[in-house]
């Protein structure tokens, strides 16, 4: 009885929209004002200590195992958005974050993390990425742009900002499936070099280089970017620093500087948050982006200045 009382207290203040909750004993309670927009059914009680310390992981796994059922139009999106808006929601409290900065992120860890995410097969990513196989934020210049066009827009936007001149050298850190490399070499006249820890991405890029007959214009390496030598006129890194880990951010920006020629130019594109640990979530770390960390703007700017 005490367990359910605690559940009721937590859930009654978890969302800012009306929600109907059916508990494991079959009883239903409505929380919030108005007709429930979402119906939640909890088929069994979850350990309270785990629920309150890592709620997204516990509830995410429960949903996967069908111990938690959610009904309603765009129900999951509504619940997540509502929880983030709700002041004091237990779903935003996560003791997991306190331990995150202490997690190991060596070169071996980085390789394992990247391969666990990207080496599940190019066929899988090809099912839902656009034809360029670009796996980062797109730039929709016009409402009717396709995803493919928006990804191409993004690459041109990056390369134009670098004010590239013919004959220069460009390094793309975390080159993925090679889109930046191909466009830079074919349309901007540079010698492009890419580096990735993903065997699948490396194989795909090598194949594309051969098919496009760009062997004399593009190099790609399967290694840690920190092991690279030499210097380049331009350095790009798109959607990469989210993978390096909090404790390696300083080294990341220092490495970018080391690899850049004097008076060279770099463009770093990534996702940032407004506060420490933004975007770090135990469910995402376990199932989607192991080792991932979303830095805030202050962190990034400080590391750039220190480099």
Language model: regions and residue ranges:
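A short acidic, Gly/Pro-enriched loop at the edge of an enzyme's catalytic core
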Residues: 226-235
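Conserved class I S-adenosyl-L-methionine
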Residues: 166-174
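Substrate-binding/catalytic lobe of Class I Rossmann-like enzymes that use SAM or dcSAM, i.e.
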Residues: 271-307
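Class I SAM-dependent methyltransferase SAM/SAH-binding core
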Residues: 186-226
